[in-house]
Amino acid sequence: MVMADGPRHLQRGPVRVGFYDIEGTLGKGNFAVVKLGRHRITKTEVAIKIIDKSQLDAVNLEKIYREVQIMKMLDHPHIIKLYQVMETKSMLYLVTEYAKNGEIFDYLANHGRLNESEARRKFWQILSAVDYCHGRKIVHRDLKAENLLLDNNMNIKIADFGFGNFFKSGELLATWCGSPPYAAPEVFEGQQYEGPQLDIWSMGVVLYVLVCGALPFDGPTLPILRQRVLEGRFRIPYFMSEDCEHLIRRMLVLDPSKRLTIAQIKEHKWMLIEVPVQRPVLYPQEQENEPSIGEFNEQVLRLMHSLGIDQQKTIESLQNKSYNHFAAIYFLLVERLKSHRSSFPVEQRLDGRQRRPSTIAEQTVAKAQTVGLPVTMHSPNMRLLRSALLPQASNVEAFSFPASGCQAEAAFMEEECVDTPKVNGCLLDPVPPVLVRKGCQSLPSNMMETSIDEGLETEGEAEEDPAHAFEAFQSTRSGQRRHTLSEVTNQLVVMPGAGKIFSMNDSPSLDSVDSEYDMGSVQRDLNFLEDNPSLKDIMLANQPSPRMTSPFISLRPTNPAMQALSSQKREVHNRSPVSFREGRRASDTSLTQGIVAFRQHLQNLARTKGILELNKVQLLYEQIGPEADPNLAPAAPQLQDLASSCPQEEVSQQQESVSTLPASVHPQLSPRQSLETQYLQHRLQKPSLLSKAQNTCQLYCKEPPRSLEQQLQEHRLQQKRLFLQKQSQLQAYFNQMQIAESSYPQPSQQLPLPRQETPPPSQQAPPFSLTQPLSPVLEPSSEQMQYSPFLSQYQEMQLQPLPSTSGPRAAPPLPTQLQQQQPPPPPPPPPPRQPGAAPAPLQFSYQTCELPSAASPAPDYPTPCQYPVDGAQQSDLTGPDCPRSPGLQEAPSSYDPLALSELPGLFDCEMLDAVDPQHNGYVLVN
């Protein structure tokens, strides 16, 4: 439900609930609505859940009170904090912590999946919060992406304990609750279950969602979803590491007793890659005994006393866990003092510039915390109390709404009397934090000179040149995750000469601001990082408002291997093909309507873009390697310049690139490298482009998907290039061995295999060509086939039966050594044969498309000396045991007849495309 905007003169001021001004609507349900409020004393934003008790039955009302009871027991940095409970006759108001950046569901929908390092940090926070709950015998039972919120610093906050319950070790629960995609199989089967094991399953689904951006179990209907959950089968995408896969599989085990426990998850190999630093919790933990007065924050108690709030009543409220106005103001003031420190991302390694070089600052901070007052929490002698803001006799405040409103919201708009104590003053609005702090910078008078050790110190030069800083920002932005600005702003900051516009937030509204917050923390509303600011402070804009100095963004140096990917194009690469937001939310239970949540088809996701981060790193380091060490051989010869459109240039360039490697050495490829990667390598104009981020991102991330037909054509083109290359190399080898066009070797001669590099071909093709239509099996060739000229007069030759006797001068078959070691280029078109002519005395046979006329096993060929040649050639070709014949002798009549029983074996033969190196021919190898 949305609050209606009536005319300004009809409104009596902002809508108020107790000390809270209602500023908007965050969410709504059947019996409750969540409003965004701001405390009028502390100026802190809160989320107020307004529940209409008159619409609830006894069972649901009991669940509401149980949720309140559970939230009162929980006090953890990664669990939404309960500040106050207000109850009237028909309404219940739950004031809780406000997570400014919303659900991680929406974050994944807008930004795509997280990388495993980010997912690990998020999952550690979830794990610590769930472990905290289980330690207090509380089970959540509804862990899902919609209930994982992100605060101002992109840290996890678990919300919505509406399905939470208490459990005892060994006792089973039976309530069917939760969201179907996250529900464990024992819930679908209607069995009793142990609460912690149920949360372990849900956390496994959550981890899968963080890493993959999709649900492991999903279906168009509830029965199909149930079937998939009970089978326990889910897809693992190509980008998931083996350790992460192992952890998820051990959590998503059908048998609850075999699932990992929280202690085992903490010790898992994937979790131990990066262990977060433990920090103290925000508030002191209540033990079995009641906390003493000394355990409360004296600074906050004194401040409340200066505001006219009874200190004794505040202490009693805290000890009794009343969660009234006194406790709420105390919690909010403590939050405003310390929340930014507890919400700071903690890293194990602190950079030297991030850490102050002296302990004097820490001692000053400790002294200021025990003696002084915060900056924006002013004492009366600073003349900053504004007691006139609140009525002096504001014992009762009316819950009033505008006169114009919709009927659906009428139940939440009735005026309720919420008693509020008398307060003589309030705090000023939070001041935007100063994001730049130099060593000797003079600060405004309302800011303390002391700062916490998280303060950043800039490098000086970067502050003066925005264009140079923006260039550095662009170069280092590539390795960082995408973050949204937490608030939509109106002011645009244009970088000089950069051509890009950045939107900056100058709203003075902040969750928590104090003296430490003002002194240079980067935490404001620019959540570009979840890590500690370190190493490089980069200017984003000049002063956008009088109250804000030049904001800096602190970025870590990027991985050099990933520098080729800018953040925007990494976002496109990380984002799944279908939007994560498309479809229903997991909380919607209308599964029978055929709507699919998270339409992430992982079977397609695993086959899209066979380009992995490994390939990019390998290609990049192959390019960087020769530049770093000139003695090394070129690492990627296949990346030579193939931009020329002429086929001859392509062939010659490919020969040059291949000749840089030995004959038996091939470029190392990734096991997962696909045809598309090879295609992109040929598309690459200059290998040096790999080191430039903006040019190579298009190569890897913007390549449109291609059909199977296009991939087949590219594959054929690659085969054609290989064939042309091998053909030219063989021709050069023939020339080297002094094999003339009309010459013919001796019958017993066997050619040695080429073992050395072959020079480029220098001999022109013979003037004879073969023009015959190709069969569909054969690959087309850009060049016409070359063959020896003595076959030109026997083009129409048919295979005739041979006599059974074979002379001693029968030609031997093709050596098996040649058949095995020749690469398989596409077969050439066969030469036609003339009917009635004698068969050629060849050491090979051309394979036609008619399989029955293929070469029979071990045919007997006549001697090559039957053909008339001139005297010079004849003297060179014939051996001592081969007599010269003056003319064409009579050839044997025919081959042996081929029986029909031998045909099946002939049809089963496999074309291995073995090459006859003497005549560029091909034979069948069975």
Curated annotation (Swiss-Prot):
GO biological process: one example: protein autophosphorylation
Residue(s) carrying Phosphothreonine: 25, 175, 484
Residues given in the record as ATP binding sites: 26-34, 49
Modified residue annotations for N6-acetyllysine: 53
Sequence ranges of Pro residues compositional bias: 822-834
Catalytic activity entry: L-seryl-[protein] + ATP = O-phospho-L-seryl-[protein] + ADP + H(+); L-threonyl-[protein] + ATP = O-phospho-L-threonyl-[protein] + ADP + H(+)
Species: Homo sapiens (Human)
Protein name: Serine/threonine-protein kinase SIK2
Documented EC number(s): 2.7.11.1
Effect of residue 175 to A: Prevents phosphorylation and activation by STK11/LKB1 complex
